[in-house]
Amino acid sequence: MKQIAFRGVLLLSLSVALVTLGTLLFTVFQDGWGQLDKTLITGVNSSDPHQAGARPAILATIEMGLLLLAFVVPIGVGTAIYLEEYANKERWYNRLLEINIMNLAAVPSIVYGILGLAFLVRGLGLGRVLLAGAMILTLLVLPTVVIASREALRAVPNSIRQGAYALGATRWQVVWRQVLPAALPGIATGSILALSRAIGETAPLIMIGALTYIAFDPTLLGPFTALPVQIYDWISQSDQDYTLRAAGGIIVLLGILLVLNRVAIFVRNRYQKRW
Amino acid sequence: MRPLVITLTAALTAVVLAGCGGSGGGGGGNGLSGLIEADGSSTVGPFTSAAAQRFKQEQSGVNVTVGISGTGGGFERFCRGETDLSDASRPIKDEERAICEKNGIAYSEFLVANDGIAVVANKQNDWVDCLTVAQLKRIWEPGSKVKSWQDVDPSFPDEQLKLFGPGTDSGTFDFFTDKIVGEEGASRTDYSATENDNVTVRGVSGEKGGLGYFGLSYFEDNRSQLKDLKVNGGGGCVAPTRETVQAGTYTPLSRPLFIYAKTSSFKRPEVEAFIRFIIDHEVEIADAARFVPLTAAQLKLAKQELRQAAG
Amino acid sequence: MASRSAVAPPALQSSRIRWGELVIKGMLALCALVSVATTVGILIALLQPAIDFFREISVVDFLTGSEWAPLFEPGSFGVRPLVYGTLAVTFVAIAVAVPFGLGSAIYLSEYAHRRTRKVLKPTLEILAGIPTVVFGYFALVFVTPWLRDIGIQVDIFNALAAGLVMGVMLIPTVASLSEDAMQAVPDALRHGAYALGGNRVHVATRVVVPAALSGIVASFVLAISRAIGETMIVLIAAGQQPTLTLDPRRTVETMTAFIAATGNGDVPRGSIEYKTIFAVGLTLFVATYAMNIVATRLVRRFREVYE
């Protein structure tokens, strides 16, 4: 009896999230499905909500997403490897590093905006460009990737490492050939969560200059916008037709997310092991 | 692992190469070309965007970008020389002017449209139709003890007053407090503030006894859910409509909207052409952006400023 | 493959330095330094204006004052209402994310079929990808009226709706990371427990969860950090009326909402009102640092290592 009750409780937990997701998606699709026309995806913003398009935003978000993955996975996993496999845990500076990363996860996204504005846009002289946006997002979600990767590395049974060392492998060989492939699923999860969050961020991007009106395709070192910023702009307009258009934009955003996630999920499923 | 790494690297290289296209300024033809950067108030942003959209049809080689860092943020960038145009829902403040001067940034101030601030109440509040400025002041001033509608006017029922309005960082807030309470920033603190006027609409329409204020277009687009209150600024009760704002009879809650232009940018033909376009077509643009066009006197002033700036 | 060195007798330490290894260690350390550079950058960006701010407003007033109204005339600068607002929302969010997240994780890891898991886990992760703006509006437009319908008297902007939605948003974080940790627990442990006569509930709660505790607690800490730092949801749904209360049914303002609203608004840069952002940001940073130090100590104590 207790068995069934326990299982029921667990299912209930799962359903809270699923039901909320379902309700959200239903509302968004209800408003937004009718908005999915060619103009939304290929056109640019307009003062007529029915003609408003989000092409520059879509392209920019995709580009930033890919750049983000390219930056955050090596740096995040590299940090995790350093902390787990190489660093002497007794040293104070390594402990500080650990705490530091946990702390960065709590910093509000807007503070990353301030940071980006001061150091990347102005300090490094990058200006208000797409690359700066991608870099800020990288810093924002780096803690998530590091923490998830660390846990993934920790979960690899030590016997694997010992066995490899016993066969004469160097530390890096152990990591690259044994530990990392084993930890790949966890790393993939962390990357998925990080990417998902970054793609939906608005506040820091506005602060470093994401535009609400741009009529040409964004380039790496040029003015840019982002889909969540465009959505936020549309939602804030008084004309309610813009809100409907925003719903369409949200569907597109979720679509992009799904595609980018698919890659990471594929990786995760392929390398999932059970010890 | 290997094939994975290779695929991802390839994808990334493709992205970077695609992204390293030319700069934003479109090419040639026999028209003008260039990039004009505008930033500032999120209220005025849609106006500049509407103007940019229409301008592109005339001059396809010119690209205009619009940001919404806020009036203050816009001026900060403007006075560092980072932008060509600054959108503003209030005139430039003295401290901001000083920074511009220090950095050697000369500019021209253009009036581009008018906006009204509508005072609205919950649809069920049928006892009130018009409020005087004095009454509004008593409701909104700092330390105000007005808690119920009855405190506003003894003939009103004893219904709790639920106040909504823009946050203290908004230009609308600055303007309202300046005109109603008499000092910018002077307001009671116990009201529901929000960044986003659509949220204020929700608040007022959802609470019986609700009272709030925001730009005219937010009332017009949500007419069915709100009740507009006439404001008596000394000349009788006037309703907030486009006509009254343009005629100047909806006082004191009519505000002008500005675009500031950097003088050095003005030397570029595309910038001058853009401003000229705005002034020539201001009625059409204001209409598209849900604002009120300039009065005849304001238009004359703007044209004068343009003549001066063009040199 | 084992490398064969010519004739050298077995030794505990390699007789020549492997430069490749040193280079790699250096590169990895460099990666780690990125996070250090970020923190340093944040501190630099925050400290200077914050120090300016504290020259004008005393730290004592700031920390103990009970009214936060810096942008009004005259201003008051007591940060406690903002702190209470953050606490109220975070508390609700964690109360949702932790139990439901962990429950979902246990189900996915110990009860669900592999195929079901393959579908459900990514579905949950979609929840993590919904823009926070959408969550904010959902809280305002759906959750608040729903709360009123079921009889809870909430203000139109309130911490409860924002906290509930934030909690649901964090469920994937807790669930996905906890579930990965549980998946990584060697099957040998499970089989051993079954062999000793345990049933599924026992195995799940007394063997797997304790074994995966490090990862599970890490997911909790991450969720708490995210909850404290979340901006958009609270900006839209929790309100911008700093109130000195922990009652989640009231309108509040969190530290993050204040920073976001003021940072993107019309306040002239360089003014004392603008500098409040940095003072509040610094407070947030210091407070979470303290929390994380405590949390890391706790995690270290509870971590179980198998093998």
Located regions from the model:
Chain B
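Flexible loop/hinge segments at secondary-structure junctions
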Residues: 20-311
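Hydrophobic helical h-region of N-terminal Sec-dependent signal peptides
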Residues: 8-14
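Bacterial N-terminal signal peptides that target proteins for export
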Residues: 1-8
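C-terminal motif of bacterial Sec signal peptides marking the signal peptidase cleavage site
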Residues: 15-19
